[in-house]
């Protein structure tokens, strides 16, 4: 899909500033309201961009992020294999995202403790083996304790679009983050009605407030009021994701490597913001990292890798060779994409 300059700027603005209304966004990125509305409607009509509302899971009692990826015996197409994997993860509430990149399975899951993780991992591996899908025993399942890890990107496509469209927002300061302590205080003291509305919003994030209200047997005003408060406190947030297969990307990279940090850095990763690395998922643990990135071509991949290597060598010493896996974005099959409702329901049940 070929985009005009205005379409590139507006698509980037929609992704970077999901919390702004149309008037605010028009002023922020410097385009006319009529142009913004026309292009936004076109993007949505063509399923290029999607609105989401996601919870702040970092304020809940989930302590471990699991990043699983494993080669499969064969590329997954429509049919029995896909049905098996879809059923596996649809019935697994801890996994919020699961994708297939050709012949590789990738999944992100949250767990309250190590016991829950081991129980779930056993069932996943058992299902893969039982259906002759697992290529070998060398599955990659790295655990990131959230208290000492940094999820720097969680399906945020801003930098992907900046690199692809050659956008350099040097003077941009982004949005102000909400105070996490207030969000945590709120999530632990929701009323019964607020819990019902929160689940209703997450179940149908694209649905207008009046339709959510009708499903929940409450008023539109109640839904709007509680949604506004939860957004302002940072209990939930708006986000936008793209269908990257429609935007001309040639390469998808899954990167993972282990390291020893240089210096006394206790938490977090290297400062790579100015590089505009085109990653949309990235996590840094105490001694390991994993990320997903998109590139328009191999030249862009090579340049980004050189820039990243220069910065990472000042941050850490790598242990062993990195896993650098390249795929065609067109081969992506999405089983789950940021489906947090089961995790939220379990949290609310326990609290």
What residues fall within each predicted segment?
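A compositional/biophysical signature of low hydrophobicity enriched in polar/charged and small residues
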Residues: 1-351
